[in-house]
Amino acid sequence: MYSSATSPTPIATRTALRPPTAAAGRPGPKQVPPPSRPAVPRGADGRSADARGQAARTALGLRSPETAPPATRAPGARIPAARPGDGRLLRPPMRPGQPAVQERIDPSALQTPAVRAALAGVSRICPAFTPRQVLREGSRHILVAGTIGRAPVVAKCLAPQAVRSEYFEQLVADFHHEVAVYRAFVRHRPPVRLPRLVAADHDRCVLVMERVPGRPAARERHPVNAPTPGEVRALLTAVRTLNLWRPPTDVFQPRLDYQLEIARYHSVGQLTDRDAGDLRGLLHGLGHGPLQLCHGDALLSNMLLAPSGPVLVDWEQAGWYLPGYDLAVLWSVLSGDTAARRQISQLAQSGGTLARDAFLVNLVLVLMREIRLYDVPGAGEEQRIMIRRLYDDAALARRAVRAAVGTR
């Protein structure tokens, strides 16, 4: 819910795709290379390269250049530019239409050493904070619901045991970034709903936010049951509204070095020589295009369905990306909803050829990350099914990239 759904390892940022500001690195996932899959030989399926490219475009919902209508934009508008969650949820999910119940203080959950240490940090900045319920106690973050007076709030703290994590420095950097993002939103209000900042302690990694009524659009990173079509439309509208927002360029920073990401996945065998060359070719054409403000972790678990509309939470990865990064994340986790994927693909290409190419670059890198997160030894049957689906999606995205390169 409010805790981060990704925990990449730190990387050095050296991309030329950035607004005029210093770049901030986006970490990569834990280096556990998946078993290499043999590349399908060209023509092995009995179809020509053009036929396979057209099939990939069709499956992704992308029209061929000959049939695609010209891009339409509002006057003056620019081209729109996992880990599996750790910790344990201590509150059962609320089903749609289920009435809210009175929350009671759970003394046992509030008395664990980690929670007590977190509450001590919260009390330093909010002495009036009254804890009510532990929403999540994980190895990286602790979430405690409570009140300040009559106002419901949520306190998010870095877990004490995170000090022993090999990614501790990156966890601290991400937490500091999220605090900075919430403070920036106080000065530059975004056009989407998000929890209001109540208080923050940058040094102790404590963040107190308004508690928004609602339920997550999904509990899992890759949900089996997708939201309803109406909910999907509302979520996509919220994401696109954020992506089209143009705050001052010095308020946020780039969060992903695309060239370095391509090189990293290429070095571990997830991308072939041709894959890496095709992606670099698309990147070359996007080198001088605008970047887009993205949430950076637009999973369904980071979106609340509230009575007033969708609410976006967990802003640790917010920043400048190539256009369509949030759409690529949503496409990757909505494998069971063909209609939603079609909507996402249509939105991705609505900005023209450059927006389509940027979406494809994002999609391949996001799928490589998901495969790297889940394709690990000891996976259960359900996870192996999901891994096979991710490999199929990645092959589809590769073919679409090759088709896009062929139209340049």
Locate each region found by the language model:
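A conserved alpha-helical element in kinase catalytic cores
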Residues: C157-V198, N225-A238
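Juxta-kinase regulatory segment immediately upstream of eukaryotic protein kinase catalytic domains
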Residues: Y2, R57, G61-P65, G76-R132
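Low-acidity, Ser/Thr- and Arg-rich intrinsically disordered low-complexity segments
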Residues: Y2-T9, T13-R18
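An alpha-helical support segment within catalytic cores of ATP-dependent transferases
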Residues: P113-C126, L244-H295
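Active-site acidic catalytic loop and adjacent metal/ATP-binding pocket
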Residues: R136-A155, G281-Y325
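Active-site activation/catalytic loop segments of kinase-like enzymes and analogous catalytic loops
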Residues: G324-T353, L363-G380, D393-A394, R398
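Conserved short submotifs of the Hanks-type protein kinase catalytic core
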Residues: R204-P216
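Conserved kinase catalytic-core helix
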Residues: R215-P254
